[in-house]
Amino acid sequence: MEDFYVEDYLVKGDRYYTKEHEWVRVKNGFAEVGITDYAQKQLGDIVYVDLPEKGKEVDAGDTLANIESVKNVAPVYAPVTGTVVEVNEDLKDEPGIINDDPYEAGWIAVIEMKDPTEVEDLMTAQDYAEYLKEIVEEEKEEEVEVKEEELIETESIEELSEEELGYEENK
């Protein structure tokens, strides 16, 4: 599964997404939940995360957590129905992890899903990238592209000359 970029916003290919900009990574009936790169950039510097309690029963659409940034307080909605079985305790001391790594270290909670087929109601990465494209185009008032990660041109450090790297070999 390919990752996508809409402008500078990363959309991970191995997740499902909501229109409220939450992501879900499903594994063996469990849903790891977090917020998207777009959401964390819109919030700005995150200063506090009000995490759910382990054992909390949630229905899809219920408030799962609240994220406080220097700009705003925003709810994080449960994308699926089930029971919270794990929360990211690291966010209590370092809520900015969400800004640094929203898709991995910045996860918020794990929900044991009541009905694993519920994820079929969520958007795929490609669908979310197209949805995000519309939002960004409206914000910028111009067209933007959805790019697959492999199509983004990068030069590996080995391909750069010593001059381009800013140093020369000692002779």
UniProtKB/Swiss-Prot annotation:
<dbReference type="GO" id="GO:0005829">
    <property type="term" value="C:cytosol"/>
</dbReference>
<dbReference type="InterPro" id="IPR033753">
    <property type="entry name" value="GCV_H/Fam206"/>
</dbReference>
<dbReference type="InterPro" id="IPR000089">
    <property type="entry name" value="Biotin_lipoyl"/>
</dbReference>
<dbReference type="InterPro" id="IPR017453">
    <property type="entry name" value="GCV_H_sub"/>
</dbReference>
<dbReference type="InterPro" id="IPR011053">
    <property type="entry name" value="Single_hybrid_motif"/>
</dbReference>
<feature type="modified residue" description="N6-lipoyllysine">
    <location>
        <position position="71"/>
    </location>
</feature>
<keyword id="KW-0450">Lipoyl</keyword>
<comment type="function">
    <text>The glycine cleavage system catalyzes the degradation of glycine. The H protein shuttles the methylamine group of glycine from the P protein to the T protein.</text>
</comment>
<comment type="subunit">
    <text>The glycine cleavage system is composed of four proteins: P, T, L and H.</text>
</comment>
<dbReference type="InterPro" id="IPR002930">
    <property type="entry name" value="GCV_H"/>
</dbReference>
<comment type="similarity">
    <text>Belongs to the GcvH family.</text>
</comment>
<dbReference type="GO" id="GO:0019464">
    <property type="term" value="P:glycine decarboxylation via glycine cleavage system"/>
</dbReference>
<protein>
    <recommendedName>
        <fullName>Glycine cleavage system H protein 4</fullName>
    </recommendedName>
</protein>
<dbReference type="GO" id="GO:0005960">
    <property type="term" value="C:glycine cleavage complex"/>
</dbReference>
<feature type="region of interest" description="Disordered">
    <location>
        <begin position="139"/>
        <end position="171"/>
    </location>
</feature>
<feature type="domain" description="Lipoyl-binding">
    <location>
        <begin position="30"/>
        <end position="112"/>
    </location>
</feature>
<dbReference type="Pfam" id="PF01597">
    <property type="entry name" value="GCV_H"/>
</dbReference>
